[in-house]
Amino acid sequence: MVATMSRGSPVTKLSLADRFALWVSKSRVTDGLWIGSAQSDSEPALQRVEAALQLINRCAPLHYRRVKNSLSRIWVTLVPHGAGCYLHSLNACLLDERVVASENTTLEWIASAIVHEATHARLEKRGIRYDEAVRHRIERICARRELDFARHLSGVDALHEEITRRLDLCNDENASYTDQNMWQKIDQGNAEMLRHLGTPEWVIALVFRARDLLNGIRRFTRRIAGASVQ
């Protein structure tokens, strides 16, 4: 369901792209927590996130305090990998706008996803990086926090089953947590995002070819630079 985009050590300065994306998003502050949406009609998404936060606060106050203490933002936007993720540069929980808007997505699910991503933020603040070798353990911890939260709810058998199923997959034999497989899924997700936005297939193919060409040039220049130093 969810995956982190956390990379490297903590930083406090936002990139220009992050600043622009925040600037164009419609947002408000709820109980000290920034919530925003990149959608043109943002109000339904913001209301659902607020309702999910109220659910966490009402049913599991400890989890709510951890969410508030761990995250700076909850941002509803297009997410390339999974239905949500933790974005380190913004200290934000990102929720995919397509999932949030779906009639099949319950408030309990949204609340559970927020608890999951807040756990990613909490672990990173403790110096636990989302490296490949420990990725399945981190996901296991986050899923367990979700499961603990879900136990405070009623009538959520389907959510219990989903979390338990994901928890069973959090092991070192699951190849989906390798860097290679995760980047492949992100590429697939980026293509689906472009299709969702109405981008023609030939443009999508061109974007990926240009990306691969630029990456190849960067690798070549690094090799040349290394040879020059030697």
Each language-model region and where it sits:
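Auxiliary, metal-adjacent structural segments of Zn-dependent hydrolase domains
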Residues: 21-92, 151-155
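Anionic, Ser/Thr-rich low-complexity intrinsically disordered regions
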Residues: 84, 88, 107-111, 137
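Short pre-active-site segment immediately N-terminal to the catalytic Zn-binding motif
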Residues: 97-113, 133
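Post-HExxH zinc-binding segment in Zn-dependent metallohydrolases
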Residues: 132-168
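Acidic/His/Gly-enriched intrinsically disordered linker/tail segments
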Residues: 156-192
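Pan-zinc metallopeptidase signature
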Residues: 177-230
